[in-house]
């Protein structure tokens, strides 16, 4: 037995989703009760989360009924976990186990940490299934994990991987399969955020744009017609622009065919299967233009290779306490993005995320 052999707990973070129509309301409440989503003190945040989850329940249930009455996100993540484990077994001699933590649904933080404690690791690596960092996604999940994790072992956090080589190549390969003529416009659609979150120093839109720049460069298609757009806008506040729906309308009026690339989603879920595939397609159908979408990266071999490569870098990093870095081991965000997780010099373990 090699006493120096590591035991590594790898935690995959994602949003989560309802596993039945009955669980839609509690899922919505958990989402909007997160301080990273609605930054208001209690009891106001609690009241608003209750109000939103109640008023949106029936509409959201109708949406989920279109895809079998539940979110496919956990099942998708389980498949990614298995593919990643298979790759990693071939690449490292270290002992490891992969766990899943969903921020707003099961398996929630208590369940995940219980499983990790039973495994008894020597270190933990946190890997978000959000390629681009935001305080509302990776930031919230990391904070939630660290504020509940009380084992004194090294924790390594993968902040983001917006321009990781194989992540970019995976997208590029899928786009090349879908480009059907020179009259196509590629819309790189990412989940939107309120503009005020970006203005407060969140690097999300910067990282989305860096991803798109890298993909376009890798595509190497002369005079490629493309735009970065944002979807899923809700409420009266100003959101990131341009809006994906609006850009499909514009393309329709210009008789431009559309290729949608879900550039910030790595798993199929309600925003891709309903919003992109059904709701937005209706806009294209109205103008009788061709509408196509690349699949999410899911278990794409090049994408799994990307995640494997990232993990190997972090497995091989010597760290006695706490590490947070992008996939290349450094901070990639300019200093003006003060909410970048890589500015964190110590683990915020005692700061409440609730």
UniProtKB/Swiss-Prot annotation:
InterPro entries documented for this protein: Ferrochelatase, Ferrochelatase_AS, Ferrochelatase_C, Ferrochelatase_N
CDD domains named in the record: Ferrochelatase_C (cd00419), Ferrochelatase_N (cd03411)
Top EC class of this enzyme: lyase
Predominant subcellular localization, coarse grouping: cytoplasm
Annotated binding of Fe cation, by residue: 191, 271
Catalyzed chemical reaction(s): heme b + 2 H(+) = protoporphyrin IX + Fe(2+)
Pathway connected to this protein: Porphyrin-containing compound metabolism; protoheme biosynthesis; protoheme from protoporphyrin-IX: step 1/1
Keywords: Cytoplasm, Heme biosynthesis, Iron, Lyase, Metal-binding, Porphyrin biosynthesis
The protein's name in its UniProt record: Ferrochelatase
Organism: Rickettsia bellii (strain OSU 85-389)
